C-alpha cells in the first residue's frame, strides 16, 4: 500500500511538472541491484550425556561440533545453515521544483524504494519498502532561509532527521549565522520514526511516541575562521522527560601567520554530565605534499531511553598522523598511523586479571598515473587491538580510454585473527567494474567480484562464505530546459 502511494505521488509530480504547474524541475533517478549469497548459523542442542571430549580437551558433539554446556540437561551449539541468496534492489529519486510563482520558493524531495527480489528474502533494511529520506519546501530570501517538511541536519552532534521546521538568518555585517530547528524526531541513523515496527529489537522498551526535538546553532564565519556552537534537546511527549540533551563546539582557523590550519571540536552530554567526543587536528599543506597530525577522543552516544546507555560505554583516546607526497607528476604516496588506548572501565575480571586496553593501526599506499588512460593504485594496512587484529592489502588498475568509458580491475586480501573467538577469518577477492557515460544525463555501470572467504576453526563448524557478487546500476537525469540554457556569447575586454 505504501509503495502504491509513493508511485502515485511520483506520477502526479511528473504530470504536474509536465503540465506547466512548475516552470522548472529536475529529477535524478538511480537504480541499483546486486546478487549475494551467504550461509548463516542455526542454533542446535544436544543432551548433556551425549557430549564427548574433543582432541583439544573441550566438549563436542559426536560429529565434531564444539558445544557450550551449563548446569542444565542440554548443551548448545551452532551449525552452518543452508546457503541463502538475496537480490536487493534499490531505486532512489531526487526531485527539485522551482519557479512556483513565489520568488525564492522551491520544493525538494529524496526517497527510495527497496526490496529483496531473491528467493530467500534475507536482505536487511527492506522494510518499509518505501522510505522518504527528505522532503521539504524551502523559501530563501536575502539573508533568510526557511524550510518545512522532512529534514536532515548535519552538525557536530551527528546528523539528525526530523519532521518539522528549520530557519536560518545571516547578518552579513558581523558574519554571523543563527539557525533554529524543531519538530518530531526520527530514529538515530535511519529515516524512520523511533516508534516504527521496523525498529523493534527491544519490544516493550521501544518508545510508544516520537520524541520532540529542538535545537539552536550559531556560526561565526569571518574570513578563514569558522566557529560554531550548537545545542540540542529531545523530549518524550508522554511525560516530558529528557531523552537527550547535548551541546557541541567546533572551529577551524589558520594558525596565526603560519601555513598551518587548525580544526577541532568537542561535545558534552548535558543529560548525563559526561564529556563526549573531542578532536584537534593541525594540517600543513604545500603544492607537492601535505602533513597532518592530531589527537581525538571518542565516546559512543546513546539516548536515555535505550538499554545501551545504562552500560556506561568506555571512551578511547588516540593520536594520529597522516601524510601525502607527490613525488612526481605521475607518482603520489600516502601514509597514515594511529595509536589508541581505552580509559579505565572500572570493572573487576577475576578470570583475566590484566585486560588489554590499547592498540595501533597503520596504512600506506600510492597511485601511479602512467598516462592519461592508465592508473595503478595500491594500499597496505595493519591493525593490532584488544582481542583482535587485521592485515589487508588491495590494488586496482584503471583504464579510461576516453571520456565515456572506464574499466577497473581490483583485488585484495584480508586476514582477521580473533583472540577471543573460536575461528580466524581470511578473505580474498578479485573483481572488475565497467562504467559507461552514455551522455550527460545517463550513466550505466556493472561490477562482478569473486570472493573466497574462509572461517577457519578446529571443529566441524568451520564454514566458508565464498561467493560471486554481481552488482549493476543505472542513473538517469531529466528535467526542464530552464537549467540547461546555453552560456551567453563571450565578451572580449577592451585593449
Predicted regions and their residues:
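Gram-negative and organellar
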Residues: 22-495
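Bacterial N-terminal signal peptides
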Residues: 7-17
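Bacterial N-terminal signal peptides that target proteins for export
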Residues: 1-7
Amino acid at each position: 500500500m505504501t509503495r502504491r502511494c509513493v508511485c502515485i505521488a511520483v506520477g502526479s509530480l511528473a504530470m504536474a511538472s509536465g503540465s506547466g504547474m512548475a516552470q522548472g524541475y529536475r529529477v535524478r533517478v538511480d537504480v541499483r541491484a546486486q546478487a549475494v549469497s551467504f550461509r548463516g548459523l542455526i542454533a542446535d542442542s544436544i543432551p548433556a550425556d551425549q557430549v564427548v571430549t574433543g582432541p583439544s580437551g573441550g566438549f563436542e558433539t559426536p560429529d565434531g561440533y564444539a558445544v557450550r554446556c551449563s548446569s542444565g540437561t542440554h548443551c548448545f551449539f551452532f551449525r552452518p545453515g543452508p546457503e541463502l541468496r538475496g537480490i536487493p534492489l534499490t531505486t532512489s529519486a531526487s526531485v527539485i521544483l522551482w519557479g512556483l510563482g513565489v520568488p525564492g520558493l522551491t520544493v525538494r524531495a529524496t526517497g527510495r524504494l527497496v526490496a529483496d527480489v531473491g528467493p530467500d528474502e534475507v536482505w536487511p533494511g527492506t522494510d518499509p519498502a518505501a522510505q522518504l529520506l527528505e522532503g521539504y519546501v524551502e523559501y530563501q530570501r536575502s539573508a533568510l532561509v526557511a524550510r518545512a517538511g522532512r529534514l536532515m541536519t548535519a552538525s557536530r552532534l551527528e546528523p539528525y532527521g526530523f519532521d518539522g521546521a528549520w530557519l536560518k538568518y545571516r547578518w552579513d555585517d558581523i558574519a554571523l549565522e543563527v539557525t533554529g530547528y524543531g519538530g518530531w524526531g526520527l530514529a538515530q541513523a535511519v529515516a524512520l520514526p523511533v516508534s516504527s515496527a521496523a525498529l523493534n529489537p527491544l519490544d516493550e522498551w521501544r518508545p510508544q511516541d516520537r520524541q520532540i526535538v529542538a535545537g539552536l546553532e550559531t556560526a561565526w564565519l569571518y574570513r578563514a575562521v569558522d566557529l560554531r556552537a550548537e545545542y540540542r534537546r529531545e523530549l518524550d511527549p508522554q511525560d516530558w522527560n529528557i531523552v537527550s540533551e547535548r551541546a557541541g563546539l567546533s572551529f577551524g582557523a589558520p594558525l596565526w601567520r603560519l601555513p598551518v590550519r587548525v580544526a577541532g571540536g568537542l561535545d558534552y552530554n548535558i543529560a548525563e554530565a559526561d564529556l563526549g567526543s573531542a578532536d584537534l587536528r593541525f594540517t600543513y599543506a604545500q603544492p607537492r605534499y601535505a602533513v597532518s597530525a592530531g589527537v581525538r577522543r571518542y565516546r559512543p552516544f546513546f539516548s536515555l531511553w535505550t538499554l545501551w546507555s545504562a552500560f556506561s560505554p568506555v571512551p578511547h583516546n588516540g593520536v594520529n598522523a597522516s601524510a601525502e607526497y607527490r613525488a612526481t607528476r605521475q607518482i603520489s604516496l600516502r601514509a597514515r598511523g594511529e595509536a589508541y588506548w581505552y580509559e579505565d572501565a572500572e570493572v573487576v575480571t577475576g578470570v583475566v586479571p590484566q585486560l588489554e586496553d590499547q592498540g595501533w593501526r597503520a596504512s600506506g599506499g600510492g597511485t601511479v598515473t602512467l598516462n592519461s588512460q592508465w592508473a595503478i593504485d595500491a594500499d597496505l594496512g595493519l591493525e593490532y587491538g584488544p582481542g583482535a587484529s587485521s592485515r589487508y592489502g588491495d590494488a586496482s588498475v584503471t583504464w579510461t580510454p576516453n571520456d565515456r568509458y572506464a574499466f577497473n580491475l581490483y583485488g585484495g586480501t584480508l586476514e582477521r585473527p580473533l583472540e577471543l573467538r573460536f575461528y580466524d577469518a581470511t578473505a580474498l577477492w578479485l573483481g572488475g567494474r565497467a562504467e559507461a557515460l552514455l551522455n550527460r544525463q545517463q550513466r550505466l555501470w556493472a561490477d562482478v567480484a569473486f570472493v573466497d572467504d574462509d572461517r577457519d576453526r578446529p571443529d566441524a563448524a568451520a564454514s566458508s562464505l565464498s561467493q560471486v557478487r554481481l552488482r549493476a546500476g543505472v542513473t538517469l537525469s531529466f528535467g526542464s530546459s530552464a537549467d540547461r540554457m546555453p552560456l551567453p556569447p563571450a565578451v572580449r575586454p577592451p585593449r
